[in-house]
Amino acid sequence: VEKEELYALDITGAKWRKSSRSLLICVEMAEIAGGAMALRDSKNPEIGDLRFTAEEWSAFRDGVRAGEFG
């Protein structure tokens, strides 16, 4: 899925998940089409989500694993 197509996707049936280690503050994530990911605030899901292509998500995940964000 291309970046410009992500926000046109209907994700009302997405299966959102969050860390089992979280308390009250948490980010939820859902895999959408083609390995793309959507993230939202679990306390305020009505404000919307951020969407990332599979390539963007992979680069972010690799950066976290490599310690690039502190």
Q: Predicted regions span which residues?
A:
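Positively charged, low-complexity terminal tracts
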Residues: V1-G70
